[in-house]
Curated annotation (Swiss-Prot):
Pathway in which the depicted protein is active: Carbohydrate acid metabolism; D-glucarate degradation
Gene Ontology process terms (BP): D-glucarate catabolic process
Protein name: Alpha-ketoglutaric semialdehyde dehydrogenase
Organism from which the protein derives: Acinetobacter baylyi (strain ATCC 33305 / BD413 / ADP1)
Protein origin, superkingdom: Bacteria
Transmembrane spans: none
Taxonomic lineage of the native organism: Bacteria, Pseudomonadati, Pseudomonadota, Gammaproteobacteria, Moraxellales
Pfam families, per the entry: Aldedh
E.C. numbers: 1.2.1.26
PANTHER family linked: ALDEHYDE DEHYDROGENASE-RELATED (PTHR43353:SF3), SUCCINATE-SEMIALDEHYDE DEHYDROGENASE, MITOCHONDRIAL (PTHR43353)
UniProt function note: Catalyzes the NAD(P)(+)-dependent oxidation of alpha-ketoglutaric semialdehyde (alphaKGSA) to alpha-ketoglutarate in the D-glutarate degradation pathway.
Top EC group: oxidoreductase
Active site per the UniProt annotation: 264, 301
Length: 526
């Protein structure tokens, strides 16, 4: 394994005009880890985009099998990093080794899942309408459509998942699977981790015969805007704050050539607890709820940050159980000093906001890098008025509980909520007749609606949706988890009256790739 040198990854080379001055910081004590990195220059941003463009011109013509083998090889090379990867990531993020071991498996599993998607071939969306020269009153020409990669993609690493939403995370894998090249902007919170994974990707490129420049990575806090504005970048993926996401989104839309910008940003992920479920198992639901909003120190974008139920003795007992469980919750290390500061500011803002009160706090922190869990209660008027403080995601181990008068008030209040990544209904069988209207409402509000589970687990699969209406994401038509994520980096192209000699294999007569296609309105592999 290569030693840390802190240089950019551009066109298969390590380059740096600036001396390595950006320090990687230990998340536990805020001391330097010893890893140093170079701030990318504007010229290096341009070099990375140029390299990605030149690579795309070749990489877009690789076969689905070649790309699948490439993704499999990345998975192998990441596994070959061994425990060193988790150890460095733990140092930079404060996350437990067991969590990072699971996250490594998530990354390699995701790579292999996309490889399966490529071999299956349905991502092409192949549609063929053969010519009907005798059709009256007008003949029909031969039309054949499939999807191709949009071009070089900029990807921004997320702070809270140093592996799964980072260098070889969902956005990168989806773009590579689509036939797009990538310029990855490493997150400042785990640059050494990113460097290790980028080295693995570079080895996979060499071993697979993939064009150099298919993957590039740059470091630095002042290059994101330049990357999004670069004319050769054709799409971008982002996971982070609402403020950061919208700033980059606006840059992407204000370019001379606007580009798709897929940002996952802000969600409070409401959990609705139904009356009969509380009567049957209220204490267990409370314990599971607190465990969910404290998981990973509350640093999940799917953390349940809002808990709502209808006033009743059972709901009062449920709140008491929430309080008791929260008080036993232990402090955990947050990802970095900036994240902890933002969390504390969010807590202070709620403490000073009318209609909110803190009703329970977890055990006091023992380290300067730890966050204390909190449970707030808010008046139903806060929900009914659409108070922005209620809808502002406080990233960390906290949640807000609200009791409403009745079902009509519940539905009225939920209408005031903005878009969400998830919405959860905790219900028993006898609650289901009342849940239908609630389900319809939440379906309009969220990308994923759960029953009797908690949203902090996000399965990587074909059916998963990790997205939702604004401000959960900048574009509710996509997902950043699961094989559907590839759709964000594809565009359709149609060939009309084109010779079989010139057509791509995916559209040729005889179906040489043996994939499922829509031919004259019929799904077939013929």
């Amino acid at each position: 394994m290569s030693e840390n040198n802190g240089k950019q990854f551009i066109n298969g080379q390590r380059v740096a005009a600036n001396a390595p001055t950006i320090e990687s910081i230990n998340a536990t004590d805020y001391q330097p880890t010893g890893y140093l990195f170079s701030q990318a220059t504007l010229d290096e941003v341009d070099q990375a985009a140029q390299a990605a463009y030149q690579a795309f011109l070749k990489y877009q013509h690789t076969t689905q099998q070649q790309r699948a083998d490439f993704l499999d090889e990345i998975a192998i090379q990441i596994e070959n990093l061994g425990s060193k990867l988790q150890e460095v990531a733990a140092q930079e993020t404060g996350l437990p080794l067991v969590r990072l071991q699971g996250e490594t498996g998530r990354v390699t599993g995701q790579l292999r899942l996309f490889a399966e998607l490529l071999r299956r071939g349905d991502f092409y969306g192949a549609r063929i309408d053969t010519a009907l020269p005798e059709r009256k009153p007008l003949p029909r020409v031969d039309l054949r459509q499939y999807k191709i990669g949009v071009g070089p993609v900029a990807v921004f690493g997320a702070s809270n998942f140093p592996l799964a939403f980072s260098t070889a995370g969902g956005d990168t894998v989806a773009a590579l699977a689509a036939g797009c090249s990538v310029v990855f902007k490493a997150h400042s919170g785990h640059m050494a981790t990113a460097e290790l994974v980028a080295q693995a990707i570079e080895k996979a490129i060499l071993n697979s015969g993939i064009p150099s420049g298919t993957f590039n990575m740059i470091f630095g806090s002042r290059v994101g805007a330049n990357l999004v504005e670069h004319p050769l970048i054709q799409a971008a993926g982002f996971t982070g704050s609402l403020e950061g996401g919208m700033a980059l989104f606006n840059l992407a839309q204000n370019r001379p050539q606007p580009i798709p910008f897929f940002a996952e940003m802000s969600s409070v992920n409401p959990v609705i607890v139904m009356p009969e479920a509380l009567n049957a198992r209220g204490e267990k639901v409370a314990q599971d709820t607190v465990a969910s909003f404290n998981m990973g120190c509350g640093q999940f974008c799917t953390k349940p940050g809002l808990i709502i139920g209808i006033k009743s003795p059972a709901f009062d007992q449920f709140v008491t159980a929430l309080i008791d469980t929260t008080r036993t919750a232990v402090p955990q290390i947050m990802l970095n000093q900036g994240t902890l500061k933002s969390y504390q500011q969010g807590i202070d803002a709620l403490l000073n906001e009318q209609g909110f009160k803190c009703i329970a706090s977890g055990q006091a922190p023992e380290l300067i890098s730890q966050a204390q869990p909190h449970l707030f209660q808010a008046d139903q008027s806060v929900l009914l008025s659409g108070n922005p403080k209620l809808q502002h995601e406080v990233f960390g181990p906290m949640s807000i509980v609200i009791a409403v008068d009745d079902e009509a008030t519940l539905l009225n209040g939920l209408e005031k909520l903005a878009g969400q990544l998830t919405a959860t209904i905790i219900a028993d069988e006898s609650d289901l007749p009342q849940a239908k209207e609630l389900l319809n409402l939440l379906t309009r509000k969220a990308g994923r609606v759960l029953f009797n589970g908690f949203p902090t687990g996000v399965e990587v699969s074909d059916a998963m949706v990790h997205g939702g209406p604004f401000p959960a994401t900048s574009d509710s038509r996509g997902t950043s988890v699961g094989t559907g994520a590839i759709e964000r980096f594809l565009r359709p192209v149609c060939y009309q009256n084109t010779s079989q000699v010139l057509l791509p294999d995916v559209l040729k007569d005889g179906n040489p790739l043996h994939i499922t296609r829509l031919v004259n309105g019929v799904l077939t592999q013929n």
